[in-house]
Amino acid sequence: MAMAVDFKMYVDQACRAAEEFVNIYYETMDKRRHALVRLYLDKATLIWNGNVVTGLEALANFFEMLPSSEFQINMLDCQPVHEQATQYQTTVLVVTSGVVKFDGNKQHFFNQNFLLTAQSTPNSTVWKIASDCFRFQDWASI
């Protein structure tokens, strides 16, 4: 019974972290993009439609070149990642999908997956992005 209670606690923690993170991430992306890299680990990796960006400086340069955006999240899912798979680092998988409109471009469907890791300090826990994978989901015209 204790294992079921422990797992439920991890799932609840993952859900709270994911909801808070998604609100912060997309609001920051749309309104304060210059601050977005603060949500990433120093050696985080972003894969944006197949293009790999690694490290805070490269991420800052990449986000700076994107046109302004309006994200609408239609779906959010999350789950804790077993600590044996992450060298006992508390980690959450967050999956989102929705629509985004970048200035000067048509609206696109997208999905985005994040691996968040808990960074603990004596007073709090902050979730940071270790890995981020973004992909447009538009169907090709036939």
Swiss-Prot record:
Pfam families: NTF2. It comes from the Eukaryota. Keywords: Cytoplasm, mRNA transport, Nucleus, Protein transport, Transport. Its main location: nucleus. The keyword Transport applies. The keyword Transport applies. Residues 17-136 form the NTF2 domain. CDD domains: NTF2 (cd00780). It is found in: Nucleus; Cytoplasm. One of its GO terms (biological process) is protein transport. InterPro entries: NTF2, NTF2-like_dom_sf, NTF2_dom, Nuclear_transport_factor_2_euk. GO terms for cellular component: cytoplasm; nuclear pore central transport channel; nuclear RNA export factor complex; nucleus; perinuclear region of cytoplasm. Associates with NXF1, NXF2, NXF3 and NXF5. Regulator of protein export for NES-containing proteins. Also plays a role in mRNA nuclear export. PANTHER family: NUCLEAR TRANSPORT FACTOR 2. This is NTF2-related export protein 2.
